[in-house]
């Protein structure tokens, strides 16, 4: 209402905001089990302070990443830092541009920025989206940002526990346990005996520190 075609709204919008918003705009009932915030129309809700993003796959490849951001800053946690963003994907590598780019990288012609796509990732990343929209300058070690990094890391863990992040064990291991226990993913991640998530998060943090003393 009151928005012209092509206009924009100045707030963070998540995918989980969309079903709730579309139902609201059509006058349909929005039940309490819907997550997200309505961002258009008569029933617009206050913007969420934080935005949670995740990824467990990149098409046929395993790629485990979590992101917590607010309006300006974004904290990335790479649970599989050994896998580059540019790991082999059949669809992507079928494109001539990808092949040419990779050959250029293998020939040692890319820079620290243009070749990063094909290199292993750091365990953690932190970006200022106002100054660095494309997330190129990783400031995870900048002393000036440690307070904000701590805040976003704390919020990430809180939401992982609240929403039962199911990606802390391999997908096939999860499926095997579900078959053996004759249960569902929904029930499995809510059973601390089968899936002690807090411990798994702690173990993952130790591994991501990449320190010999943690072995």
Q: What do these predicted ranges mean?
A:
Residues 11, 26-125:
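C-terminal cap/loop subdomain of S1 sulfatases and analogous C-terminal strand-loop tails that border
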Residues 108-124, 131, 139-215:
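Long, internal low-complexity/basic segments
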């Amino acid at each position: 209402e009151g928005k012209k075609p092509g206009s924009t709204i100045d707030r963070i919008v998540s995918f989980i905001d969309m079903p709730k918003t579309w139902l609201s705009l059509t006058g349909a009932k929005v039940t309490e089990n819907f997550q997200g915030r309505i961002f258009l129309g008569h029933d617009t809700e206050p913007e969420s302070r934080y935005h949670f993003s995740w990824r467990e796959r990149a098409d046929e490849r395993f790629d485990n990443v979590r992101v917590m951001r607010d309006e300006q800053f974004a904290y990335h946690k790479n649970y599989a830092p050994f896998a580059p963003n540019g790991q082999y994907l059949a669809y992507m590598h079928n494109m001539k541009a990808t092949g040419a780019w990779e050959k250029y990288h293998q020939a040692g012609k890319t820079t620290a920025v243009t070749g990063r796509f094909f290199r292993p990732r750091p365990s953690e990343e932190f970006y200022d989206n106002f100054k660095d929209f494309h997330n190129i300058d990783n400031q995870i070690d900048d002393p000036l940002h440690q307070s904000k990094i701590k805040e976003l890391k704390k919020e990430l863990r809180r939401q992982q526990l609240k929403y039962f992040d199911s990606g802390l064990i391999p997908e096939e291991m999860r499926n095997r346990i579900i078959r053996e226990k004759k249960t569902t993913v929904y029930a499995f991640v809510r059973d601390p005996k089968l899936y002690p998530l807090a411990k798994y998060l702690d173990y993952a943090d130790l591994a991501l520190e990449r320190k010999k003393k943690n072995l």
